[in-house]
């Protein structure tokens, strides 16, 4: 396999390729396993990491673009905040020494406590890292999210200090479970491959269970309850998800139907879009359920707060029927909980009490 041997020098000559990680949904990374415990992790943009097992030598004449990390991997700089939950569930938070959020920005206890105790250090946000700190404390790798593509000079500067970086592309995954499957990438990176499989399979099981209990007649589209997922921007527009985004797919897996279809989508590359209030009104007034997304503005505590933000919502069917929900503030940091979120949506649609929900609550 010529592609697999590309640039690997002696790894390929001396190390025998064994197998590749089986991926069910994720499309934006791969992991190859070699004899002797060596691994090659590759992301969507072609960046490669070679992990070298403890006590083993780094192969000679390896391509200079390949990032080499010796196990046990440590001193990571985690800028991609959505991934901390994966490290937390993998029991791998101790591999992270630097954070792109300070303690008050985290809903994840282990991260917040590590920063409060000084074991983890705040090293600045993605666009303004504390280079001096990262260099003096021997940062091994920066894990960025796709925002870094807007600040290429940061990646260049990190590189000039011999700090390699990778971008995690879980947000590019169209399937909700494809996002969760990135836990296997970080499981491979931190040598917790089996644990990662376990965590991923647990979320898959939840989704499969919902599909079974749902008994949804997928052919009969008219049966599905419709759901709008939105938030009100500071200038009074309504931000919604495009029909191709992962949130509409979660709604569908939960047995519902997203209220907007492809005919409403704009043609930007983004997963969200802003609508004029009038268009949202016309499109969602008859939605069976409304979910207010709290991730941007901290959300609302009750129905009156929501109606203060947007009085015309009082005309909406979901408001009249008492079917308005809000996401909890920590939802966007809980990347390993997509299965639970789908479960909550399913509970909402089937009329189960909201007391059992983890990431949604009813606005009263």
What are these regions (language model features)?
Residues 1-12:
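Single conserved hydrophobic/aromatic residue that forms the stacking wall/gate
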Residues 75-78, 96-99, 141-145, 165-168, ...:
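Structural recognition of the beta-strand scaffold that forms the well-ordered cores
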Residues 173-202, 211, 215, 286-364:
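Structured C-terminal subdomain patch of bacterial secreted/periplasmic proteins
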């Amino acid at each position: 396999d010529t592609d697999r041997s590309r640039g690997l020098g002696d790894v390929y000559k001396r190390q025998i390729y064994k197998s590749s990680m089986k991926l069910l949904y994720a499309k934006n990374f791969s992991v190859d396993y070699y004899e002797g415990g060596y691994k090659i992790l590759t992301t969507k943009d072609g960046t490669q990491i070679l992990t070298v097992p403890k006590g083993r030598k780094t192969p000679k004449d390896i391509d200079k673009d390949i990032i080499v990390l010796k196990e046990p991997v440590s001193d990571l700089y985690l800028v991609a905040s959505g991934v901390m939950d994966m490290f937390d569930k993998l029991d791998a938070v101790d591999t992270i020494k630097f954070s792109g959020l300070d303690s008050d920005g985290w809903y994840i206890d282990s991260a917040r406590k590590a920063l409060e105790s000084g074991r983890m250090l705040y090293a600045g946000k993605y666009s303004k890292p504390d280079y001096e700190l990262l260099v003096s404390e021997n940062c091994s790798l920066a894990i960025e999210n796709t925002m870094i593509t807007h600040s290429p000079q940061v990646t260049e500067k990190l590189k000039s200090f011999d700090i390699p970086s990778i971008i995690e592309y879980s947000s590019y995954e169209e399937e909700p479970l494809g996002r969760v499957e990135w836990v296997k990438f970080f499981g491979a990176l931190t040598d917790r491959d089996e644990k990662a499989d376990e965590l991923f399979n647990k979320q898959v099981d939840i989704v499969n269970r919902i599909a079974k209990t749902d008994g949804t007649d997928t052919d009969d589209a008219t049966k599905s309850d419709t759901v709008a997922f939105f938030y009100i921007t500071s200038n009074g527009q309504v931000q919604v998800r495009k029909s191709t985004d992962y949130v509409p797919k979660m709604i569908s897996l939960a047995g519902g139907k997203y209220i907007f279809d492809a005919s409403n989508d704009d043609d930007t590359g983004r997963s969200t879009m802003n609508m004029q209030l009038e268009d949202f009104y016309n499109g969602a007034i008859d939605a069976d359920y409304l979910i207010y997304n709290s991730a941007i503005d901290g959300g609302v505590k009750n129905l009156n707060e929501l109606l203060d933000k947007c009085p015309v919502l009082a005309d909406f069917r979901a408001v009249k029927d008492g079917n308005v929900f809000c996401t909890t503030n920590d939802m966007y940091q809980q990347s390993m909980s997509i299965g639970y979120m789908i479960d909550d949506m399913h509970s909402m649609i089937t009329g189960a009490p909201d007391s059992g929900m983890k990431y949604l609550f009813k606005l009263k």
